[in-house]
């Protein structure tokens, strides 16, 4: 985060919840932000990103002390939005994943594909290099298709139709292609721009766990 007062507000907010900020880097010109225009009825929500030139986007991969960061840690989670910010973030994520594995830290990742940040081709190329270091992959049917070309059979994303059997295939393909121990998939049945039915699925090798939609 930047070293000015706005950056300090971020640090203070994290500390408020007991988050250790010892290794949080300070520098760069500005804090990245985004704006959300909430949808209504059948009009979808709209997101506007304002992250160009932000502190995280301009950070250098070698600035992060991964050995120190992962000392005593047992879990490292990162999101697909981070490498999508460009610059040296893809390399920073790769170094982080490698360091975490060397320390015996469990690595989880949310694919979180955002087409406004990078193309499908860029996402597929970068994420394919990172996923082999991931133990737990969190995805949905759209991300799996956009990033890796993996589709849920008998499922229509646009209509919100859910078919659990199709998602088992998606989870299995991700696990087999990249060696992930577990794959979690969020299942959304779209009712309107503001109302959805949600369910979850966890694929663990040959075992499958699902929740009821709510």
Would you name each region that the model predicts?
Residues 92-102, 126-133:
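Catalytic-core regions built around general acid/base machinery
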Residues 117-205:
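Conserved phosphate/ATP/ADP-binding segment of small-molecule kinases
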Residues 82-91, 119, 148:
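Glycine/threonine-rich flexible loop motifs
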Residues 39-41, 203-207:
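Short acidic-glycine loop/turn motifs at beta-strand connectors
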Residues 106-108:
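Short beta-strand/loop segments at the ligand-binding rim of alpha/beta enzyme cores
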Residues 2-81:
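Conserved N-terminal subdomain of the carbohydrate kinase-like
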Residues 53-57, 84-86, 113-118, 159-163:
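Short, flexible loop segments at the rims of nucleotide/cofactor-binding pockets, characterized by
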Residues 209-214:
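Conserved small/polar residues in nucleotide/adenosyl-binding loops
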